Amino acid sequence: MFITFEGIDGCGKTTQSILLAKYMSDLYGEDNVVLTREPGGTSFNELLRSVFLSVSDYKVDKLTELFLFLAMRRESFVKVVESALRANKIVISDRCVDSTVAYQGYGCGIDLDLIYKLNSLVMGIVPDMTFIIDIDIEKALSRATRNGYESNSMDFYHKVRKGFQRIAEEEKHRCVLLRCDDYEENGICDVYSVHNKIVGLLQGVLHNKMDAASSSVKV
């Protein structure tokens, strides 16, 4: 099963992907769960990621940026994701296809049809389930700044956030929109309440997936 976490910088998706990977590892065994991230996931991609983040003051051409992310996604898919899925493992990714659609498509204005076609060429599959974490932009950016993320204009993040919301609306068969406002205590999002919601939503889906995988194994 291929599970992805999406959302704007600072939304908490990385925390949720780590929590879910720990939960799944305890349940199914560490050897049956793969946690990865984009950009990143391989030694080559992590090197490119560090270079990309270290030159945040350098404005990369929009199409150049798109092709860089797609190249890293292809590398991660071939070296990590594809083989794990073939082995019937649970793959959890911090960002994937929808980030490209939201950031490069809705945020930067690159043609959405082009992005979808290129993503199809790069991966050929879509995630089985995607959790999109929706959060107030100012709250998210205050957290992202502390985490060292590159800052962009508020207008850019409004476009990206709306992009994620649109994706969730158009692809309800696989996307779940989790609004942080629904899980706040004293103005702070309770990460464990969000985690418990995710686990609850996944239980039935995972049970069916694992049963199907087991029944397909020839003895």
From Swiss-Prot:
Signal peptide range: none
GO MF annotation list: ATP binding; dTMP kinase activity
SUPFAM superfamilies, alphabetized: P-loop containing nucleoside triphosphate hydrolases
Highest taxon of the lineage: Bacteria
UniProt KW Plastid keyword: no
Transmembrane parts of this sequence: none
GO biological process assignments: dTDP biosynthetic process; dTTP biosynthetic process; dUDP biosynthetic process
Top enzyme category: transferase
EC number assigned by the record: 2.7.4.9
Reactions catalysed according to its record: dTMP + ATP = dTDP + ADP
InterPro entries assigned to the protein according to its UniProt record, in alphabetical order: P-loop_NTPase, Thymidylate_kin-like_dom, Thymidylate_kin_CS, Thymidylate_kinase
Alphabetically ordered keywords of this record: ATP-binding, Kinase, Nucleotide biosynthesis, Nucleotide-binding, Transferase
One cellular component (GO) term of this entry: cytosol
NCBIfam families: DTMP_kinase
Role: Phosphorylation of dTMP to form dTDP in both de novo and salvage pathways of dTTP synthesis.
Protein name: Thymidylate kinase
